């Protein structure tokens, strides 16, 4: 009983990180969002590790893990991109439903939305599909499609990258509808296509593939040092690029 509690407790901490991230995302405090998501991703790794070490793997824990991940790695990046759409200057529409509903419910129903910004929640839908597929497949050294935590890190780090001093002149090109829509749709595709990506766990069976994993880690360090926390977006791009090279290498 105690053994099962430890990994499940770590999973719930991941969920709490996701909930706090949502609150900060709505306040445009993207640095706090990224830190909390990083903590959630770490806890997501630790709960699985703890379950294996304690021999406490269970179907309950597996389902709880997915439910936590859909918040931290699905809902949070969707909200962050929704906020980016709003920051890009999209038109906000006001809806007044008082004339229709007020006589019945006596409520003040006036709200404002940016319709195009709702495209951001395709990320949440794509993440849900990805996590459902993940529950039916046992991954070892490789993934099929971009893992939801990696996808989440890309998007929650994006606001910080866009505001970085090195990219200030490119901000208008990064923070616009065309870029955000392209990134959103691309992420949904990348999460759900059968494209092989390596995990960062070193393999004792495929020594030649370890070089790509080591390269990912080593090259990530100067990127983070140069771009700060926003560099995590570039690290995910690096990860995808090295996977393309690795897959082409395997064909030779």
Description of each model-found segment:
Residues 140-252:
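C-terminal membrane-associated helical module and adjoining short loops/tails
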